[in-house]
Amino acid sequence: MPTDTFYRLPQQKRDRLLAAIHGELSRVPVTELSVNRIVHEAGISRGSFYQYFRDRDDLVQYLLEYVDSCFHGFITAAAPACGGDPFELLRRFLSSIRAFGDDPVNRAFCTNLLAHLRANGGVQHCRSNAFSPEWIEGMFDRYFDRSRLNLAEPEDFKLMTELMQTVLQGAVAALFMPGADADALERAFDRKLLILQRGMLKKEAQADAC
């Protein structure tokens, strides 16, 4: 976590530092991040940097929290326009991530950050608590109607949202793999959502499965 000193920085100075970090991570992997290059680009001293972050892991954790805050902002802005359809929100979310990654600098940044996460226990191992089950439940009930879901057991809602998250996270990670075919990935993502919406068994087979 960044120190309180970082959060007390004027917004302009904080944005300049974040832009320098973004630029550095778009050029090199996390393991090759240069504090010297970051502070030079941001126009601050090396000592100041370590007043804001303890080490590289601290910096990566902050980047994850920053990304999560951007995701929160997108969800809050997009959800009201989805007509009460949570699957439409996921489609719009992936489209926005794809558009973000169309910029080569953004794409390199995300590719390097995701590669670091995969090498260090995966995304969930490193994430903040920004997308806790409580946050997801509150967000869903604010913008969507839970009564439209086919919930057979009390725990089904949590399991359903976990499935949706898994499909979304897999699609986002795949978008930033070398040689990714974004059109094909988006089509496959849409098909997976349709399968989740309708279920996997034909109606005549559902009775046999119960």
State what each model feature region is:
Residues 1-28, 37:
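Basic, helix-initiating cap at the start of DNA-binding domains
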Residues 13, 56, 63-71, 93, ...:
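Hydrophobic/aromatic residues within well-ordered alpha-helical segments
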Residues 16, 53, 60-70, 74, ...:
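Alpha-helical DNA-contacting segments of helix-turn-helix folds
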Residues 16, 27-58, 62:
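Helix-turn-helix
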Residues 62, 76-105:
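Hydrophobic alpha-helical connector segments
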Residues 78, 82, 108-117, 171-179:
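Secondary-structure edge/capping motif, primarily at the C-terminal ends of alpha-helices
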Residues 111, 118-170:
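Amphipathic alpha-helical packing segments from all-alpha helical-bundle domains
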Residues 170-210:
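C-terminal peripheral helix-coil segments that are non-catalytic and often amphipathic
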